Amino acid sequence: MSIKDYMFKLLNDLDYHGFILQYYEAYSTSSCYIKLDYGISNSIRIADHKGKDKYPYRFNLMIGLDKSYENNGRYYYSIDDYNKMILDIKKFKDEQLDKYGFSYYEYMLKNKKEGKNKKGFWSKAKNYNDKF
């Protein structure tokens, strides 16, 4: 499967689990990016190469990675650990919901509104399943 194929698989699987999703396909590389619940549950990077340190994606699906690992709060998953990544993403959202309660959804709306005026990901991303 290609990086783009994995992106659409993730979008489909995460939609099933109730996430609001935006996605972006990079122009200069084959990398793809998914924002979870307008960023409240962080983001996913899908790639076959090391990313830039200034963009700290919490969840990374790495094509060609032999073994999954964690480094400074960032998680790098091999294709073999795809299902573990889905479970970890769901667990992280559950922790955010426990922490913020109903405010979680208020933060989503705030990020959605503020994101409309931002450059970068927000201006180029496509909505996959915006239910808000």
Locate the predicted segments by residue:
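Negatively charged, low-complexity tracts enriched in Asp/Glu with abundant Ser/Thr
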Residues: 1-41, 68-83, 94, 99-132
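Intrinsically disordered, low-complexity regulatory segments enriched in Ser/Thr/Pro
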Residues: 41-91
